[in-house]
Amino acid sequence: MNAQDVLKVHYEQFYGALLSGDLNALSALYSDNYRLVRSDGSMLNKEQVLRDLREGGLAFTSIMLCIEDVRVFETTAMVIGESHATAIRGGFTTSTQFRLVAVYEEIDSALRLAYFQSTQLPHDVSVAS
């Protein structure tokens, strides 16, 4: 596993599945012990995240990783960065800018997303560092 492998999975599999609404692909990507920590501090497990996407009507229309820093530690990798996302929920469009940490683990020669945490940034904070 190297940084390029991790970013490919992050962009193509994770962001790709979110943008296309492919819950089966997300389910396959998320590890069984996956945890999402939202900007408000709430924490969801794999099934809760998939249920929220399915029943909550959340649809992403764009996701852009603006700054990325990948760290690889044997069979674990972290993506640290800043991102912009636009999504629709309940007929309302929201655009957010946030910092993120995504932790991937290598399981049976495949990268699986084990943890994702985001911290929303005020709209007037520059994404560039």
Which stretches of residues belong to each language-model region?
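A beta-strand edge to alpha-helix "cap/lid" segment located at domain peripheries
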Residues: M1-A25, R35-S129
